[in-house]
Amino acid sequence: MAADGVDERSPLLSASHSGSVTPTAPPYLQDSSPRAELPPPYTAIVSPDASGIPVINCRVCQSLINLDGKLHQHVVKCTVCNEATPIKNPPAGKKYVRCPCNCLLICKDTSRRIGCPRPNCRRIINLGPVMLVSEEQPAQPALPVQPEGTRVVCGHCGNTFLWMELRFNTLAKCPHCKKISSVGSALPRRRCCAYITIGMMCIFIGIGLTVGTQDFARRFHATYVSWAIAYLLGLVCLIRACYWGAIRVSYPEHSFA
């Protein structure tokens, strides 16, 4: 798990070693305080118990974790709460971040934002400026800053992502499914109506040219080009109207602006 290729959004302990206990996230409560998403600190101090076996307190439930044969690992799993506790400094260029749901994450030390991968959490943790920490001490989480933007529920996959635009009626690309949707329904509705209006006007103009210039077109065949242009523009506008009418809409969940 210390390799550089580890997905930064995934929990540090895989599901294959989760045992019989499944960690659950507490219900999400919107807190106006910046400490609502402050990851709890930890101290990677290994102390032997009375029998000489190295142990450490779990940073979530404070239970003792046996470190016998695990000192080569960066994190260990608590058998009581099933959460991860770090016992070593993170790899170079990385840092630990603990989500308020107690999921321990690893990310680049320059990261400003990280998302929790647990399906029942899906929080987006905003980290403050990077702080330099000596290698002798475990990395401490940076203070989260108040984000600007909107939590948006994707109209395709239903996942929540942070949209940094401070206005609605824009197109957004979901980072989960990579599909484009409209943030709010006003933009596609307005553009659909506009394209329908322009398309019908072009078709009516084409019909008028066809009826009014039939005799003229028999002598000057270039008149047929104007008919084709009018009908083609009308068809293109109607196709665009169908696109905007069928586009998926993503709705904002909470606004931080």
Curated annotation (Swiss-Prot):
Reaction(s) catalysed by this chain's protein: a 1,2-diacyl-sn-glycero-3-phospho-(1D-myo-inositol-4,5-bisphosphate) + H2O = a 1,2-diacyl-sn-glycero-3-phospho-(1D-myo-inositol-5-phosphate) + phosphate
Region annotation Disordered: where it falls in the sequence: 1-34
Active site: C107
Principal location class: membrane
Phosphoserine carried by residues: S33
A GO term from the CC aspect: late endosome membrane
Keywords: Cell membrane, Cytoplasmic vesicle, Endosome, Hydrolase, Lipid metabolism, Lysosome, Membrane, Phosphoprotein, Transmembrane, Transmembrane helix
Membrane spanning residue stretches: 192-212, 227-247
Motif CX5R motif: chain residues: 107-113
Cellular localisation: Late endosome membrane; Lysosome membrane; Cytoplasmic vesicle, Phagosome membrane; Cell membrane
Catalytic EC class: hydrolase
Protein name, as recorded: Type 2 phosphatidylinositol 4,5-bisphosphate 4-phosphatase
Biased composition (Polar residues): 13-23
Residue(s) carrying Phosphothreonine: T22
Biased composition (Basic and acidic residues): 1-10
EC code(s) of this entry: 3.1.3.78
Record membrane topology: Multi-pass membrane protein
General function of this protein: Catalyzes the hydrolysis of phosphatidylinositol-4,5-bisphosphate (PtdIns-4,5-P2) to phosphatidylinositol-4-phosphate (PtdIns-4-P). Does not hydrolyze phosphatidylinositol 3,4,5-trisphosphate, phosphatidylinositol 3,4-bisphosphate, inositol 3,5-bisphosphate, inositol 3,4-bisphosphate, phosphatidylinositol 5-monophosphate, phosphatidylinositol 4-monophosphate and phosphatidylinositol 3-monophosphate. Negatively regulates the phagocytosis of large particles by reducing phagosomal phosphatidylinositol 4,5-bisphosphate accumulation during cup formation.
Gene Ontology MF annotations: phosphatidylinositol-4,5-bisphosphate 4-phosphatase activity
